[in-house]
Every structure is written in C-alpha cells, then in structure tokens.
Regions:
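Non-catalytic linker/capping segments at the edges of enzyme domains
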Residues: 1-43
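Short, electropositive, low-hydrophobicity segments enriched in small/polar residues
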Residues: 20, 50, 57-58, 95, ...
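Hydrophobic core residues within well-ordered beta-strands of beta-rich domains
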Residues: 23, 32-34, 76-78, 94, ...
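Generic alpha-helical structural signal
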Residues: 54-55, 72, 119
Length: 137
C-alpha cells in the first residue's frame, strides 16, 4: 500500500470527529478488547425500522480495525464475514466489541460481536486484516 496517505484527517465515517455526517464513534480499549456503543437513527434503516445490514457491517469492521490500531498496527481489512443473528431496530443501542483471534506476522484474524443491552447478540463478524504500517503514537 505504498504511496497512500494513511494520516488521520478526522473525516472517517465511523470515528471522524470532523465528519458531520459520520457516526462519531468513540472507543474504549482494555488492553485486550476494543468496544464502542452506537444506536442508529431512522435515516440508516433498510426495511422499515430495521437498521440496514451494511451499516452494522461497517461498524463491526471499524471496531476490528480499531483494535489493531490500539495494538500498534495500522491495518486494512482483506476479508470480512458477517453473520446477522437478529434484526436490529432503529434507535436500539448496541455494544460492539472486538478481540484478536490470531496473529501471524502481518496478518491478523479478528472477531467482533454486536450485542443489545439485554445481552442478545444481533450480529457477529470475523475478519482477516493485513498490517500496512505501525500506528502513529
């Protein structure tokens, strides 16, 4: 990925603090897992009052890549697999968390889950990510 500008201009759709159309996600890192909480407004629905699966996939991907950044690696998703378990209703807050499954050189396998407040898991994901540079400190 040489030649790409990987600097953060705070316009990321998921976490960019300067993106007025973004989700404004903030993350917590406990040394092993990254987590965030989000609820989607109606403008992000697919079917009536159901969050579009693409948006949920985006947040699952974001939390997995953010885990690697917090662990010191800028990474890009090479493969993403999402399993939708239950419909997510517009406005329902979810916790999305990610953890490392495996690390081999520059390749990382990461998992994530999206869970309602009552503990119901609405989606889970796995990704293969490739480190592209050390994360800025």
């Amino acid at each position: 990925m040489s030649g790409l500008d990987l600097s953060d201009d705070s316009m990321c759709f998921c976490c960019g603090s300067r993106n007025p159309d973004g989700l404004g996600l903030e993350f917590e890192f406990d040394g092993r897992e990254v987590s965030t909480t989000v609820s989607f407004p109606k403008k992000f629905q697919g079917y009536r009052d159901i969050v579009h699966g693409g948006l949920l996939s985006t947040v699952l991907d974001e939390v997995m890549v953010t885990l690697l950044i917090k662990m010191g690696q800028l990474a890009a998703t090479a493969e993403l697999s999402v399993r939708f378990l239950k419909p997510l209703r517009v406005g329902d807050p979810i916790e999305v968390r990610a953890w490392l499954l495996e690390s081999r050189g520059r390749v990382f396998r990461v998992a994530a889950a999206a869970t309602l407040k009552d503990g119901t898991e609405v989606a889970r994901a796995e990704s293969t990510c490739v480190a592209v540079a050390p994360a800025p400190t």
